[in-house]
């Protein structure tokens, strides 16, 4: 019984460390911009984006980074996790036509060591 209690306590103490090693990045889509406009992720490490929209329907997708087409709705959150396999700087443009400034709506993803 003591082993079970010790195991449970150890698990409870280590679980937050696992979450800390893989934090999510909050991104807000609004009319014609993403905030933040640039993010940095690490090569061969999972990255989770937590996306929401403050107005309008937007989307992201990147075959280079392995991000499937993801719709971002107002006042709700959607998460997408990907593992970058190549160093570099990538531009992700809004994947859903959202108005006059749609072509300027992008987020820069920097993949570093």
Which residue ranges define each predicted feature?
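N-terminal, post-signal-peptide region of Sec/Tat-exported proteins
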Residues: 42-79
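Non-cytosolic beta-sheet module surface loops
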Residues: 31, 51-53, 84
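N-terminal edge beta-strand
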Residues: 21-46
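Bacterial N-terminal signal peptides
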Residues: 7-16
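Extracellular/periplasmic metallocenter environments
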Residues: 26, 73-113
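N-terminal post-signal-peptidase region of extra-cytosolic proteins
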Residues: 30-37, 64-67, 75-79, 92-93
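Positively charged n-region of N-terminal signal peptides that target proteins for export
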Residues: 1-5
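Exposed beta-strand and adjacent loop surfaces of beta-rich binding modules
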Residues: 24, 46, 57-59, 89, ...
